[in-house]
Structure formats: C-alpha cells, structure tokens
UniProtKB/Swiss-Prot annotation:
Protein name, as recorded: Methylamine utilization protein MauD
Membrane topology (UniProt): Single-pass membrane protein
Function comment: May be specifically involved in the processing, transport, and/or maturation of the MADH beta-subunit.
Keywords (A to Z) from UniProt: Membrane, Transmembrane, Transmembrane helix
Domain Thioredoxin positions: 48-180
Transmembrane segments: 3-23
Highest taxon of source: Bacteria
Metabolic or biological pathway: One-carbon metabolism; methylamine degradation
Amino acid sequence: MTFLIASNILLWIAFLGVTVVMLGLMRQVGLLHERSSPMGAMITDHGPDIGDMAPEFDLPDYFGRSVHIGGASERPTLLMFTAPTCPVCDKLFPIIKSIARAEKIGVVMISDGAPEEHARFLKNHELGQIRYVVSAEIGMAFQVGKIPYGVLVDGEGVIRAKGLTNTREHLESLLEADKTGFASLQQFMASRKKNAA
C-alpha cells in the first residue's frame, strides 16, 4: 500500500514538472514568434496605393513651423506614423534619424494623442532635422490602422513604398523598394520567379 501511495505522489510530481516545462516552452515559442517579424515592411491594402499621388497637407508642426506633406519637394520624404506612447516607435526613433541622415531624405513623424504625451516624448528625444506633426487627419487620409507605419513619398509627391515598420529592416525595405522599383519584397520575388520561368 505504501508503494502505491509513493508511486502516485511521484507520478503527480512528474506530471506537474512536465506541465511547468510545457508552459515554459509555450512562452519561449511565443517570444520567438514575436521576435521573428516578416521580411520587408508589411503592406496593408488600405489607403492610397503605391504609385498614387500622396494626399497634400499644409499644416504647422508641433513647434508651429509650416510643414508641407505631399506634392513636389526637393527630396524624398519618409512619413512615419507613430504615437508618443508606442514602445516600438520609441526604439525606432534613433534608427529613423540615422537612416534619414544616411539616405538624405526628409522625415516627418506624424502622431496623435494627448499634448502631455507629446511633450514627454519630445523631452526625451532630440528631433534634429525631423519634423513632428500632431494630426489625426493625415493618418485618416493614408488610412493607417497600425503603427509604426511608414510611407515613402518621392520628390514628385508619388507614393513609392509603404508598410508597417517594426524593425530597421522594415524601414530599409521601404527605401530599397524605391531604389529597385518593386513595391514589396513579395513583388520582387514574384518577378524573379516569372523571369526564371
């Protein structure tokens, strides 16, 4: 009888151990899934299409300086839709600055939210040449559903690339899309397949 009780207790301990290990594995798979983002910026099918003229806006930035979005400009402009409370946007900010310098493009960060959140965000980040605009209207015109979201507009005001930009690779894929003429990595791969056939 004592043997049966001891074996039953050992089985329950083993069962609980396997359960703990399984929960740990599930957590690790979840973290791995979260970290392995898709290659290239994920394009949503909402808003103006690639190749369309970008909607035009003339409005003040956070500091009251005039900003023109869309239409002809001296250089390409990256419109980054962000939020002051978005942790991914916070991580991307130095990357956006470095890419803007390296690629010699203009950057307009477009955000929405409470004034105190913007003040806190701007207190912690040096903008440099980046313009910071608070406008829900622009986000609605581009039909941005998730952030951070990037739209690359060329010097003639045409949308060259757009997509969800969670990592440096996603941001760089927007610029590569403009350089190669392919709107997305998927379009590039499809053209290679077509040429090979």
